[in-house]
């Protein structure tokens, strides 16, 4: 299992290199680095590994995936789940891997909180953002954290008192059982919920300070589609793509359309190739 140690914590990482002979780039040119930042609790790097990372790598980028602190196969600590900690973890992982040039961050759901704050904290290290159904942007405190905390609070009770992990394992659902056990330990055994409650939204004035290009992709029926519209209004260089007929599960249920949009955007900004399937996709 590939691991790196950053800030004294073990992180599970996976990397995918582009094809060795990439006609889209000169032989002496380093490929762009695209880093994938997943969502909370039941999510991990596998959600990107089986959807976006392979095609992005095949298009000529070096894909970097990692499990957030306490998620997947990364080390779980009792505390340290604030946005600032997540940003420091991200750059710690990149430093451990030797990636110090500006990178492109592809974020899903809560991963957007990490990506946005990373772009604001270290603009010299972030070349661009792809925000997929991402939390973070809001005009007022509590706009998205209240719903998220309510959902996680209910999940915490089910995991702890109904012993969901044991039930899933008992009927042979091993992967889901392991995920539930990890989620139980995370929400009931760490400072995660308290740290989330303290996170401030990224307001319009801060969004206006984002210096890198941003691609925002949201589902038409998503509860947080207004976050995408706020990004479009506030970020100086932002492209918004709303996926018709979709809600929050764009990454899983709209992968092909999402890839078409994202690969064209990366080709324009990062210099990767545009595969035939992406050329046939909808326009930005």
What are these regions (language model features)?
Residues 107, 111, 115:
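Gly/Ala-rich beta-loop-alpha elbow adjacent to hydrolase catalytic centers
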Residues 140-146, 155-209:
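Conserved alpha/beta-hydrolase catalytic His-Asp/Glu region
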Residues 12, 16-73:
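Conserved HGGG/HGGXW glycine-rich cap/lid loop of the alpha/beta-hydrolase fold
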Residues 214-246:
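Conserved loop-alpha-helix segment in the C-terminal half of the alpha/beta-hydrolase fold
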Residues 103-104, 127-130:
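Residue in the alpha/beta-hydrolase core beta-strand immediately N-terminal to the catalytic nucleophile
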Residues 238-284:
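Catalytic active-site module of serine/aspartate enzymes centered on a nucleophile-bearing elbow/loop
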Residues 116-120, 129-157:
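Flexible "cap/lid" loop of the alpha/beta hydrolase fold
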Residues 54, 65-104, 260:
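Active-site loop/oxyanion-hole signature of alpha/beta-hydrolase fold enzymes
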């Amino acid at each position: 299992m590939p691991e790196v140690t950053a800030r004294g914590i073990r992180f599970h990482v996976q990397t995918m290199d582009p094809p060795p002979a990439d006609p889209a780039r000169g032989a002496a040119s380093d490929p762009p680095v695209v880093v994938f930042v997943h969502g909370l609790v039941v999510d991990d790097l596998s959600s990107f590994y089986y959807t976006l990372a392979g095609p992005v790598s095949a298009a000529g980028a070096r894909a970097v995936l990692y499990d957030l602190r306490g998620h997947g196969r990364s080390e779980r600590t009792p505390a340290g789940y604030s946005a600032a900690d997540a940003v420091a973890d991200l750059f710690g992982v990149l430093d451990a891997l030797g990636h110090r040039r500006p990178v492109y961050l592809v974020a899903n759901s809560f991963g957007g909180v990490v990506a946005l704050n990373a772009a604001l904290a270290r603009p010299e290290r972030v070349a661009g953002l792809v925000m997929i159904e991402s939390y973070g942007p809001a005009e007022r405190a509590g706009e998205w954290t209240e719903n998220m905390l309510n959902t996680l609070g209910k999940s915490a009770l089910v995991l702890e008192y109904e012993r969901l992990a044991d039930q899933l394992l008992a009927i042979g659902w091993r992967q889901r059982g392991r995920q539930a056990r990890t989620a139980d330990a995370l929400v009931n055994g760490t400072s995660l919920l308290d740290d989330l409650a303290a996170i401030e939204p990224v307001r319009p004035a801060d969004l206006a300070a984002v210096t890198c290009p941003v691609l925002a992709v949201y589902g038409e029926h998503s509860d947080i589609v207004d976050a995408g519209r706020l990004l479009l209004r506030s970020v100086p260089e932002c492209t918004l793509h709303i996926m018709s007929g979709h809600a929050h599960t764009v990454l899983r249920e709209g992968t092909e359309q999402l890839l078409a949009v994202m690969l064209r955007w990366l080709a324009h900004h990062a210099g990767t190739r545009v595969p035939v399937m992406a050329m046939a996709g909808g326009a930005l």
